[in-house]
Amino acid sequence: MESQQLSQNSPTFHGSAYASVTSKEVPSNQDPLAVSASNLPEFDRDSTKVNSQQETTPGTSAVPENHHHVSPQPASVPPPQNGQYQQHGMMTPNKAMASNWAHYQQPSMMTCSHYQTSPAYYQPDPHYPLPQYIPPLSTSSPDPIGSQDQHSEVPQAKTKVRNNVLPPHTLTSEENFSTWVKFYIRFLKNSNLGDIIPNDQGEIKRQMTYEEHAYIYNTFQAFAPFHLLPTWVKQILEINYSDILTVLCKSVSKMQTNNQELKDWIALANLEYNGSTSADTFEITVSTIIQRLKENNINVSDRLACQLILKGLSGDFKYLRNQYRTKTNMKLSQLFAEIQLIYDENKIMNLNKPSQYKQHSEYKNVSRTSPNTTNTKVTTRNYHRTNSSKPRAAKAHNIATSSKFSRVNNDHINESTVSSQYLSDDNELSLGQQQKESKPTRTIDSNDELPDHLLIDSGASQTLVRSAHYLHHATPNSEINIVDAQKQDIPINAIGNLHFNFQNGTKTSIKALHTPNIAYDLLSLSELANQNITACFTRNTLERSDGTVLAPIVKHGDFYWLSKKYLIPSHISKLTINNVNKSKSVNKYPYPLIHRMLGHANFRSIQKSLKKNAVTYLKESDIEWSNASTYQCPDCLIGKSTKHRHVKGSRLKYQESYEPFQYLHTDIFGPVHHLPKSAPSYFISFTDEKTRFQWVYPLHDRREESILNVFTSILAFIKNQFNARVLVIQMDRGSEYTNKTLHKFFTNRGITACYTTTADSRAHGVAERLNRTLLNDCRTLLHCSGLPNHLWFSAVEFSTIIRNSLVSPKNDKSARQHAGLAGLDITTILPFGQPVIVNNHNPDSKIHPRGIPGYALHPSRNSYGYIIYLPSLKKTVDTTNYVILQNKQTKLDQFDYDTLTFDDDLNRLTAHNQSFIEQNETEQSYDQNTESDHDYQSEIEINSDPLVNDFSSQSLNPLQLDKEPVQKVRAPKEVDADISEYNILPSTIRSRTPHIINKESTEMGGTIESDTTSPRHSSTFTARNQKRPGSPNDMIDLTSQDRVNYGLENIKTTRLGGTEEPYIQRNSDTNIKYRTTNSTPSIDDRSSNSESTTPIISIETKAACDNTPSIDTDPPEYRSSDHATPNIMPDKSSKNVTADSILDDLPLPDLTHQSPTDTSDVSKDIPHIHSRQTNSSLGGMDDSNVLTTTKSKKRSLEDNETEIEVSRDTWNNKNMRSLEPPRSKKRINLIAAIKGVKSIKPVRTTLRYDEAITYNKDNKEKDRYVEAYHKEISQLLKMNTWDTNKYYDRNDIDPKKVINSMFIFNKKRDGTHKARFVARGDIQHPDTYDSDMQSNTVHHYALMTSLSIALDNDYYITQLDISSAYLYADIKEELYIRPPPHLGLNDKLLRLRKSLYGLKQSGANWYETIKSYLINCCDMQEVRGWSCVFKNSQVTICLFVDDMILFSKDLNANKKIITTLKKQYDTKIINLGEGDNEIQYDILGLEIKYQRSKYMKLGMEKSLTEKLPKLNVPLNPKGKKLRAPGQPGHYIDQDELEIDEDEYKEKVHEMQKLIGLASYVGYKFRFDLLYYINTLAQHILFPSRQVLDMTYELIQFMWDTRDKQLIWHKNKPTKPDNKLVAISDASYGNQPYYKSQIGNIFLLNGKVIGGKSTKASLTCTSTTEAEIHAVSEAIPLLNNLSHLVQELNKKPIIKGLLTDSRSTISIIKSTNEEKFRNRFFGTKAMRLRDEVSGNNLYVYYIETNKNIADVMTKPLPIKTFKLLTNKWIH
């Protein structure tokens, strides 16, 4: 009990005085473990200095008063007799008093007179004072124990008398025992007992007395509780309870051992090697250190040793760092081998020719202490170390052996101990004679060698002797070769054993080698260790493992020696052994070196190349080939690693072990991209191992439920149809097969799931080969038939039917025959894609045709009918009511099979199945819930975008056009039902007449460029682009080459079906002009940029036809009474609204004034445009809108296109690519990539826990994140985020209700570091939240509108922040979350009480909470239609999650709101906004400078300066600045992009990061960049080099203009009304797929508050339609902004809309209700009329060169761009 009490209170016994003493006890450069009895005086010299300077009395303490010091109560300390120590030999209190020993009190409080203490230990007096120091022993001791009669011979302790002795602290743990012993020994020394303490050898200076022994025993017992002693100490004390000195002796020995360990660690950590010494020497040094540590039970792993070695490599060896940097399984032997090879290679490179051996007389021997002075040549050998994970014995410092035995290492001889002599002649040695071998001449001191002794070498792996006198069982050597460190051969004469007879009669035997050419006889400790014999260099003895001493060893010079007297002579008389000649491999290069020098080439390749003299200066005989064929290069094994080879026919045993349908193979193929949603994207296949019967099932996704349904169906089918049970299913390791659902399904049905090994697809060959076969058939069938892609699974289904019916080359029966089924009835099969006519039993009218053209796909699974595809109805049907269409070729026509016909053959095969069309057709519905795998084909929904042609950029002279033969190619697509049969079926009638057509169109007019179409495009294009004659956007078809030459008289047009229309007479006012132009070459055209003569037709029309709507360009005030005027607002100010009042104060460019009401003909003086028509300069597609007369590239086909003519090659290369297996290269199609872009993926700006804390190398930043982490935890607990009263077990909670959590970290814009504990809402189950709830934030337009009104009305702007806003909202659902990591509750869950960040419902919950509080407690009302905008009579609030922006005329009103908020929420004032000077804000990323009554500036300079350089974009801060984000004339190449998968993902990620930041900036305030951002965003999935360069150019422009700001000035006070204006513009057909770009800019009182640039959702057919689309997009937002302005500011409002399209204005204002050109055009126009008249909207014309919305729709020249933007952003 006492020892336990002392242990608990020991840290505070000694207070500050103790700390002051121990702080000096070990100097900084002294190892604290290097303590022994011999150096204790020096060790304690400083530790007791303080004690010697302080005097204490028994009743006082020398410790300064310390509030941390707690003195234990004496009465509470029981005596130690109750412990486990034995109490024998203890003195009674009477004896103690008789011997004048003082009372032995509590150890830390003892008081004693000098040397008058008693060993007695009994209960102290409770009232006895307890000082904290012990007086030392100072008088001479009594008689020693057991030597009373020799008292005079015992040396007396003579020490300096000291006032106090610092007692040791109490032992607190078993691990601290070695440290505690140091203090205890010091305590004994200070108590004048240092001369009786044994050293590490167990030696003492004098014997201790009985009293001293009792004193040591009692103090040791008091300060070292028995239960805290190490095991080895307990074992000693259990034998002899008082043997404290033995414990101290072994402790001191362990200290010195630990000191050696520390030195070894330091040496290992500071290793350095640069090749200046031999690689063997370095290896031996390292191995010795590691072996020594291992002997001390410290194992150094190969990985750690390699890392320490690599750190110290330099010179030519430094490159090994990079080689081993990424290796995880590093072997020390491999690293040494690499170092040796580099060392050998450097040696060879320093020599001019292969070395030759010199005569032995030219060599000199050297000792260990003198360097080798010989200039011996180096000869490399086949030096290879076996790569083994087993520990190797330490190698000798001076030898290396090469043996046929695997256990003998091929080591080296150190030049310091082995002579380099070479025996030139064979000699014979008589083993029974005295040694007479010639000793080498050595340049060493005669005192270096100890005669008749063996040198003990701790690094030697073999024992070498110079004399055969001691060699037993000697045999001639023919296997072992020894070379020195210079690779010179050392002959070995014989191999035998050395027999030892040690002191105690112990005999042992070790293996030894005989050679006369060494300097010393070497004894290997490794060989001795194999016999359980070790050397103790501290006691200088050879010992057994049990501690038995066998023989002493002698230290002579620098080495340890063993006398030869322990060797037993051999007594062999005359046995002779032939000496061994030098190795045949001398002078030969090792194969590993040559293998490495020749780039790790194959063994046979190297050997053959040398035979053929392909490599000069090196012969085949110069290389050691002995082990070359079996040599394993580690680098080759890693770099050339391949999968194991599968043996052919290895699966035959499964066919013998299983019956049919018991062993199935399955695999999933997909996805197939760019298909309608109703078509499957995957299929799953099954193959029976025994019969090879195949099944395929379509899949729309790879979800668990879908896969499970298929497995249920196939198992039921096999069980019912074949009466078999599936036993094994083999599959790969895809997640669709390894999920828990499917595993449970297999387990319940007793099916064995057999998975392939990792990355071993060849083991799944049956299923993989089936998929490949089916896809090959699919591609072939679709290509041959020309059917659309969405029917791809029908082709797979047809192939499966055929493959099951045919005999494979390896089987004698088909799969159907193996399964016991009848053969395939050929009369029931039609060619895939065979044209047929299907009876329509339910026509729309009695007079409509009853037959519908279709294409046969495959026999039905569910009936005796056939699955037929009907393009006109966009669906497939299962019917028997069809007739094969005669004389209708399929795509075989393209192979010039015109002379072949299959009609007779088909009639003969299907004669008995042909019948009249009857009313028994069964139409398949997609929604039918059947098990048929063709249900997906029914009612396929296809988008109905109009067909658009693809043209080339070349312009050729019509006179040079030759008629091109037409290839009849059919691609049946969905066609309107009312189109004639000729438009649906493959037609041989193709127009061969080229067209000349104009596609140039601008709002100011254009020219018609002479061009021709490819014959394969003519008919389709004419039908699609037919227009009424005389319409403003007519395009004249020149259908005859001759008519182009002689004028436009009698022009003939061609319909789709090939019929002709009446001639169109040439207008008399139309003039044709031919011009010579420089045609702009396309990006794809690399042939020439020279001038070409191209006819440019300029058509000047003076009168328009009467069948089009009239264009009224007059504003309302100038129109006649025949025209209706829009409704005007009834207030007085509205009566004076004019175009000038609308245009007034707008930031328009300063140009020559032109009246906005100018009605002059805009088509006058139209300049001729000599360049070809292309898409937009930035983001447009080259050559997409221009007709060509040469081979044009066919764009990707859409599933909804009508019949078109395509090239077979392009069909196969582009449209079928999605059906090909995965490739190493990824092909990206521009159109598909653009259509695939849905939105810009946000780039992660936060850090995970491991990134912010665990692996963060920035300690300062790490500390800040740790601080933020603890702050977040405290806030979570403060807010009662979860229920802390109960923890729930994970197994008891529904997994759907469990939410994963994580910590995210980020650095805020103000520099503070923030941590946030969030829920993984991205994987939250849908049942745990209400999807109807919405998380609202303030719209950016609402914020900009509020800021604009604040500037005009001198409002105060206050910025607030609510800390942990979401945590104020309660959560309604029952959800559980995993605890934070610091709690350590991995298997527990917490019940959520608050809306944690990240949950789907948290945003909505917080919105409802704060909304309710603002309305009920702050008297606010939310503005209708604008979420998160609240107002009352004085204050307006814009809410963005936890940020609040307050606007008020009176600052006190803002303060009142703040006071109310603080009652409920932790509200921080970011910026109160008081004062009349300029105030700076950071509001939602916008850096705002605001001075009331004057101006407001909005920018992001600081943010962009920080973020842009981190994007890894090559910015040029000192170079020439860009003046525009892009230039006209740059075209994005539409060629497919071929790129590696990894590189593609990397570039897409880079595009997302760059465009994400640019989009954020653009929509905040840089509206001038929105066009470029929107266009590049469409190409995120097409990261070509060109797209990336344009993106870099945009980022560079943002960097150059990062200081630009959106400038607002206060509105003139004379303006009584608010004026809200939208400026609209459109660019016709300049985007991919002929889409138009539309843009709008919104201004409030002359201040730009928003902008929008986007691609039109529908394809417009003219410039006017595009402009109407742009206006229709602007009006709804204009009306919503108008409502917001009226709510926030009660002034009257004037709404205006400006456009530069006079035709659009005319259509809006016209009352003519004549039928429009098409339905879309008419509905849009009529809707605009209603919106303009119903919303009091003023529509006026703005000149194009003043239309600032022009920057939203197209790239502009630098001058124009600056002119349109410098008024509002600068």
From Swiss-Prot:
Mg(2+) 1 binds at residues 667, 732. The keyword Chaperone does not apply. Keywords: Aspartyl protease, ATP-binding, Cytoplasm, DNA integration, DNA recombination, DNA-binding, DNA-directed DNA polymerase, Endonuclease, Hydrolase, Magnesium, Metal-binding, Multifunctional enzyme, Nuclease, Nucleotide-binding, Nucleotidyltransferase, Nucleus, Protease, RNA-binding, RNA-directed DNA polymerase, Transferase, Transposable element, Transposition, Viral release from host cell, Virion maturation, Zinc, Zinc-finger. Residues 656-831 form the Integrase catalytic domain. A motif (Bipartite nuclear localization signal) lies at residues 1193-1227. It comes from the Eukaryota. Residues 369-381 have a biased composition (Low complexity). Gene3D superfamilies: Ribonuclease H-like superfamily/Ribonuclease H. One of its GO terms (biological process) is transposition. Residues 1-39, 49-60, 399-408, 415-435, 916-929, 1009-1024, 1065-1082 have a biased composition (Polar residues). Its EC number is 3.4.23.-, 2.7.7.49, 2.7.7.7, 3.1.26.4. It catalyses: DNA(n) + a 2'-deoxyribonucleoside 5'-triphosphate = DNA(n+1) + diphosphate; Endonucleolytic cleavage to 5'-phosphomonoester. Residues 1625-1767 form the RNase H Ty1/copia-type domain. One of its GO terms (cellular component) is cytoplasm. Residues 1353-1491 form the Reverse transcriptase Ty1/copia-type domain. The record marks 397-398, 578-579, 1232-1233 as: Cleavage. The keyword ATP-binding applies. Initially, virus-like particles (VLPs) are composed of the structural unprocessed proteins Gag and Gag-Pol, and also contain the host initiator methionine tRNA (tRNA(i)-Met) which serves as a primer for minus-strand DNA synthesis, and a dimer of genomic Ty RNA. Processing of the polyproteins occurs within the particle and proceeds by an ordered pathway, called maturation. GO terms for molecular function: aspartic-type endopeptidase activity; ATP binding; DNA binding; DNA-directed DNA polymerase activity; RNA binding; RNA-directed DNA polymerase activity; RNA-DNA hybrid ribonuclease activity; zinc ion binding. Its main location: cytoplasm. Capsid protein (CA) is the structural component of the virus-like particle (VLP), forming the shell that encapsulates the retrotransposons dimeric RNA genome. The particles are assembled from trimer-clustered units and there are holes in the capsid shells that allow for the diffusion of macromolecules. CA also has nucleocapsid-like chaperone activity, promoting primer tRNA(i)-Met annealing to the multipartite primer-binding site (PBS), dimerization of Ty2 RNA and initiation of reverse transcription. The aspartyl protease (PR) mediates the proteolytic cleavages of the Gag and Gag-Pol polyproteins after assembly of the VLP. PANTHER family: TRANSPOSASE, PUTATIVE-RELATED, TRANSPOSON TY4-P GAG-POL POLYPROTEIN. The capsid protein forms a homotrimer, from which the VLPs are assembled. The protease is a homodimer, whose active site consists of two apposed aspartic acid residues. The C-terminal RNA-binding region of CA is sufficient for all its nucleocapsid-like chaperone activities. Integrase core domain contains the D-x(n)-D-x(35)-E motif, named for the phylogenetically conserved glutamic acid and aspartic acid residues and the invariant 35 amino acid spacing between the second and third acidic residues. Each acidic residue of the D,D(35)E motif is independently essential for the 3'-processing and strand transfer activities of purified integrase protein. This is Transposon Ty2-OR1 Gag-Pol polyprotein. It comes from Saccharomyces cerevisiae (strain ATCC 204508 / S288c).
